[in-house]
A protein has these predicted regions:
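Positively charged n-region of N-terminal signal peptides that target proteins for export
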Residues: 1-7
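Bacterial N-terminal signal peptides
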Residues: 8-19
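Secreted/extracellular ectodomain signature
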Residues: 22-150
Length: 150
């Protein structure tokens, strides 16, 4: 057998022998960006820079010409993401479950309040994104960091 045929067989063998199928989020980047005014953009793509560009473009379409779309982004693969707005302070967090993402956002909110903004306004959920990149209606609208910190 020639060397090229051997290499081809070695390359194809794992695919033929029953490698598990890829899930959509195994190779899709999901990006979230939020502005200080609450406008946001979400996009998914197999290439991270493309997902970033699409999310910023969608944010700008929502926000209008004067905005800070792209100033703060989060990119993840297969994670839940939540974006909260606390006055004009943005918090974007991710986690393997919705509860983990919400917990991470709450931890960031508490840290922000303890170390940088003692009079941090109550946070409001701006957008929730599931592991496939779909936007999910949120039933949690306001944070409870003030109660958790007491």
């Amino acid at each position: 057998m020639s060397g090229s045929i051997k290499r081809a067989l070695l390359f194809l063998c794992p695919f033929v022998m029953g490698a598990p199928p890829c899930m959509a989020w195994d190779h899709e980047w999901t990006v979230v960006t939020v502005t200080r005014t609450g406008s946001w953009g979400v996009a998914s793509d197999s290439v991270q820079p493309q997902a970033i560009a699409k999310a910023i473009q969608r944010c700008r379409a929502m926000a209008g010409p004067a905005n800070d779309c792209g100033a703060q982004i989060m990119a993840a693969k297969g994670d839940w993401m939540v974006a909260n707005l606390c006055g004009d302070h943005k918090i974007i967090a991710s986690g393997s479950s919705l509860l983990d993402a919400e917990r991470e956002a709450l931890n960031r909110e508490i840290s922000l309040q303890l170390f940088y903004v003692p009079d941090l306004p109550t946070c409001k959920r701006v957008v929730t994104v599931d592991p496939t990149g779909a936007i999910v209606p949120s039933n949690q609208q306001y944070s409870n960091a003030r109660e958790a910190g007491q």
